[in-house]
Amino acid sequence: MGKRKPIPSINIGNNLNKKLKFSKQDSDQQQQQQQEQQPQQPQQPIIKYKSKREKEIHEKIDKIKSERKFIYKNAERHVKLSLEYAGLALSLPAVLKDLHRALEKFDALESSLIAELESLKIPVKNASTIPVLHPPINHVNTSIATTAAASINNNNNNDNTITTTTTTTTISNDNLASTTNSLPVNSVPRTTATLSDVNSLITATLGPTTAPTIGSSATTGDTTAIDGTNTNVTTDTTTIETTMKKKGRPPLFKEIPENCYVCGVTETPYWRRGTDEGVMVDLCNACGLRYMKLEKKERLLKQKNSTSNVLN
């Protein structure tokens, strides 16, 4: 028998160290390339606040700016949806009106915070360059201010006393009587108006003697005089009442929702429902349509995954 050849020894430790070194170098090079490709973001300067209240005010202002950006994005989304779906164009003015109210509240809050900072003599951050949709509101009437200043100067020159004069418009009793008399005489409640309309229809069809009025109790003498025609009158009144009733589908909501769960809109032509982590939430028409699209995509993806698993 021949001698066995010796197996060459392999130094596993050195080979592993080499592989780890090469892999580490490759990862470092990849990170450097990614950093070079990405644009360097400017570092925000660290602001030292003088007091706790100053920090709270600046944080509130930043939050208002972020909320305002969200409102502008929401308005843009509603406009795009109204262009895609013609039915949503009717509700667009109401949606924009709600967003305008929210922007006015944010503007008032931001102006009060900036005024507080100015009173504390604290430098305010640079204002945002977001365009404002609504026109500025002039709270001061210059003509009133100038006339008031002129009257104060005249009074100071005369007796060094300030006198204030107020002009009020009063309505006399004759004017009130004329306005009350100008109201229509036939303005009656809705229930009585409908009953009178039904009675006029009955008198036109059956005659004034045989047609009893609805809502009034008939005496025994009237019932004996009418005898056999009462059956026809009752059938006519029931048919008129049934035709007056509006036939419509039952409402989806027992109570009208206050606002949309996603965008916070309070007015919409049609309210919808959705789920958020198993909880039912109220959605406006635009958000509800978007939710239905996303739900349909997820359902199709689940079906594709299930069919591929079965075939495999």
From Swiss-Prot:
One of its GO terms (biological process) is positive regulation of transcription by RNA polymerase II. Residues 1-45, 213-232 are annotated as: Disordered. Residues 29-45 have a biased composition (Low complexity). The keyword Metal-binding applies. A zinc finger (GATA-type) spans 260-287. Gene3D superfamilies: Erythroid Transcription Factor GATA-1, subunit A. Pfam families: GATA. It comes from the Eukaryota. Keywords: Metal-binding, Zinc, Zinc-finger. This is GATA zinc finger domain-containing protein 20. The gene is gtaT.
